[in-house]
């Protein structure tokens, strides 16, 4: 399959952006970006999206230099409603990166803030905030700064145990935050001076284990091992870590469960343009099916699954032709949806457990504007299986939110 039956752009801001290749990339400092009116106000990304079954709306966390970070999108009216995050942001809170979590018990959202500033401003920046948003009362509560000076790349929650876990950035560590006591603690470092792991997002399984990836240290050696990026899991009871020697599969691995789905014509791997030029099984996304499997997407574009009962990892297929696979979500009926891609070659995939194939959809273009997402960073799905695609890092214009219905 190659086409969606319907894709539509939903435009929050619509700035045309100029000079990325000619003036900015590899040259500017962050302060210059902030000082430029068009880039400060127009260079937004939809970094995270979450469907709320209570009100049928989609909540959108942005990358926005001006600190305007949280919006509600109402599908029925196709309206964006700003949630006035600038009530609490400071100049260094410029992203809700991953993830925007909805707690069904208290009906609040939980998220962390991330950064764009350079290293010379780290002493001015207080660190990433953990925030709770009560949408019924329209009230924000800054729960704390789990790791001062560092910012929050992603979070996962075990609301039953009153825990939020997160990965920090740019120095990579795993923290645990106790919601009742509002206390944060660093549990482990996950990256190091030798290697950048950037696990993107962790998940908590049904038994309370937190899953993520880490980079080996090898301070005693000059050479990486064959598996420098590996899986770990952590349980708060007994504060137990299991550091595995295996990681996620690579695109070149030949053993896989399913055939590769069709790919867009002319879409070659763009891995060399990412921070991860080599395919070491870097984790780009994780989604738990609520039962047994954690699905994971790799930066190189492979889909795999982790069996939480045996800790085994299986490669399913190569699904993103260009690489980058940051979007994964599981619908209420168990259908897995994924999204990713680079350089305009973006894709959506669908897998129904038990099927012998993965469906692939590309040519994601809204005919009304003759344009499509440059990249997709995350996706959400509603009860009618409409998809919400979060575009990010478009350097020609403001990024948009996109809706898609698959045949």
Predicted regions and their residues:
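Surface-exposed loop and turn segments in beta-propeller and other repeat-based domains
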Residues: 12-39, 84-92, 142-150, 188-194, ...
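Repeated scaffold domains used in trafficking and secretory/extracellular systems
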Residues: 43-50, 92-101, 149-156, 194-203, ...
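Residue-level detector of Asp-centered blade-edge/turn motifs that repeat once per structural unit
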Residues: 52-55, 102-106, 158-161, 204-207, ...
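Short loop/turn segments that connect beta-strands within beta-propeller blades
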Residues: 74-78, 134-138, 178-182, 235-239, ...
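Conserved beta-propeller blade signature
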Residues: 57-61, 108-110, 163-166, 209-212, ...
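Blade-level signature of beta-propeller repeat domains, shared across WD40, Kelch, NHL, RCC1
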Residues: 373-407
């Amino acid at each position: 399959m190659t086409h969606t039956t319907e894709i539509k752009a939903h435009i929050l801001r619509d700035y045309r952006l100029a000079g990325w290749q000619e003036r900015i990339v590899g040259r500017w400092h962050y302060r210059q970006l902030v000082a430029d009116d068009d880039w400060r106000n127009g260079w937004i990304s939809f970094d995270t999206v979450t469907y709320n079954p209570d009100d049928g709306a989609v909540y959108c966390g942005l990358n926005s230099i001006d600190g305007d970070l949280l919006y509600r999108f109402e599908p029925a009216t196709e309206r964006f409603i700003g949630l006035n995050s600038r009530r609490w942001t400071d100049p260094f809170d410029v992203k809700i990166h991953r993830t925007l979590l909805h707690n069904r018990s208290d009906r609040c959202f939980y998220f962390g803030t991330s950064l764009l500033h350079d290293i010379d401003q780290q002493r001015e920046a207080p660190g990433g905030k953990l925030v709770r948003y009560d949408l019924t009362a329209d009230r924000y509560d800054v729960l704390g700064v789990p790791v001062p000076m560092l910012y929050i790349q992603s979070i996962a929650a075990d609301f039953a145990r009153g825990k939020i876990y997160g990965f920090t950035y740019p120095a990579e560590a795993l923290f645990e935050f106790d919601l009742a006591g509002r206390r944060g603690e660093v549990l482990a470092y996950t990256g190091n001076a030798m290697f950048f792991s950037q696990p993107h997002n962790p998940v908590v399984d049904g038994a309370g284990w937190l899953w993520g990836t880490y980079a080996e240290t090898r301070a005693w050696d000059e050479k990486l091992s064959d598996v420098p990026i590996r899986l770990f899991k952590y349980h708060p009871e007994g504060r137990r870590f299991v550091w595995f020697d295996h990681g996620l599969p690579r695109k070149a691995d030949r053993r896989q469960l399913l055939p590769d789905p069709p790919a867009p014509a002319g879409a070659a791997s763009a891995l060399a343009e990412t921070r991860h030029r080599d395919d070491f099984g870097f984790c780009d996304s994780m989604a738990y099916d609520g039962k047994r499997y954690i699905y994971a997407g790799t930066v190189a574009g492979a889909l795999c699954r982790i069996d939480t009962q045996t800790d085994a990892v299986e490669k399913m297929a190569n699904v993103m032709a260009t690489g980058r696979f940051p979007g994964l979500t599981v619908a209420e009926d168990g259908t897995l949806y994924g999204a990713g891609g680079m350089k305009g070659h973006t894709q959506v995939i669908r897998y129904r457990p038990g099927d012998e194939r993965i469906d692939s959809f590309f040519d994601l273009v809204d005919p009304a504007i003759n344009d499509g997402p440059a990249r997709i960073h995350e996706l959400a799905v509603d009860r009618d299986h409409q998809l919400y695609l979060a575009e990010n890092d478009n350097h020609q214009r403001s990024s948009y939110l996109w809706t898609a219905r698959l045949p």
